[in-house]
C-alpha cells in the first residue's frame, strides 16, 4: 500500500472542500481491511483533522448499514456544511447505549472511516473516497483479534449485509483510490 499511500498523501493539499469549509475523506472497505489504521495515518498528515468512526454511528448490530444510518450520515454532513459544526451521538458498544452527544466546530479535514462510509447518501460531500480491499478470511481474523471472540457470532450476518451493501452502493467502483489491505495493518 505504500506507493499508493504516498500518492494519496501528495494529493491531500490540493483537495477542495465540498462540505462547507471541510474537506471530507471517506475510507470504506470490508471489515478488518485496515480503514482505521489508514485514517490514523492520514490524520497525522493533516493539520486540523477530525475522524468520525462508523462504529460510533451504528447503534448496535441491528442498525448497521440501514436507511436510518444513511439518514443520520446525511444529517451529520448537512450540519457540517450549513452550520460549520460536527454533531453526533456515539454508540457505546460495551454498555449497549448512546454516549453523550459530541458537538464541536467543523475541522478543516474530516475523515469518515468504516464500513458504509462511502455510501451514496453522503458521496456528494466527499472530496476524496478511498477503498481498502482485503480477503474475507484475513478481514474476519483481524476483526476477531481486534474486537474479541464475542463478536464472532455476529460476523456471518454482518458480512452478508456488508457484501449486499457494497454491491448496491458500488462503493469500490466509485472510490477515487483502491488500496490493498492484505499486508500487515
Go through the PLM ranges and name each one:
Residues 1-24:
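Extreme N-terminal, non-catalytic leader segments
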Residues 149-185:
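Small-molecule kinase domains that catalyze NTP-dependent phosphoryl transfer to phosphate-bearing small molecules
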Residues 58-110:
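Conserved nucleotide-sensing/catalytic segment adjacent to the nucleotide-binding pocket
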Residues 32:
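Walker A (P-loop) phosphate-binding loop of P-loop NTPases
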Residues 99-146:
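ATP-dependent NMP and nucleoside kinases share a basic, alpha-helical "lid"
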Residues 48-62:
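Short beta-strand-centered segment that lines the nucleotide-binding/catalytic pocket of NTP-utilizing
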Residues 38:
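Hydrophobic positions on the alpha1 helix immediately C-terminal to the Walker A/P-loop
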Residues 35:
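Conserved lysine of the Walker
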Amino acid at each position: 500500500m505504500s506507493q499508493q499511500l504516498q500518492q494519496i498523501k501528495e494529493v491531500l493539499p490540493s483537495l477542495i472542500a465540498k462540505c462547507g469549509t471541510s474537506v471530507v475523506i471517506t475510507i470504506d472497505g470490508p471489515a478488518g481491511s485496515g480503514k482505521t489504521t489508514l485514517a490514523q495515518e492520514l490524520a497525522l498528515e493533516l493539520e486540523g483533522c477530525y475522524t468520525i468512526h462508523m462504529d460510533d454511528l451504528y447503534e448496535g448490530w441491528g442498525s448497521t448499514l440501514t436507511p436510518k444510518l444513511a439518514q443520520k450520515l446525511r444529517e451529520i454532513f448537512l450540519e457540517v456544511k450549513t452550520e460549520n459544526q460536527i454533531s453526533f451521538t456515539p454508540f457505546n458498544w460495551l454498555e449497549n447505549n448512546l454516549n453523550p452527544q459530541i458537538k464541536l466546530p467543523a475541522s478543516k479535514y474530516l475523515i469518515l472511516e468504516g464500513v458504509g462510509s462511502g455510501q451514496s447518501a453522503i458521496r456528494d460531500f466527499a472530496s476524496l473516497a478511498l477503498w481498502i480491499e482485503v480477503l474475507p478470511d484475513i478481514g474476519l481474523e483481524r476483526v476477531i483479534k481486534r474486537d474479541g471472540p464475542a463478536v464472532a457470532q455476529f460476523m456471518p450476518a454482518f458480512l452478508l449485509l456488508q457484501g449486499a451493501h457494497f454491491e448496491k452502493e458500488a462503493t469500490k467502483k466509485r472510490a477515487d483510490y483502491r488500496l490493498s489491505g492484505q499486508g500487515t495493518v
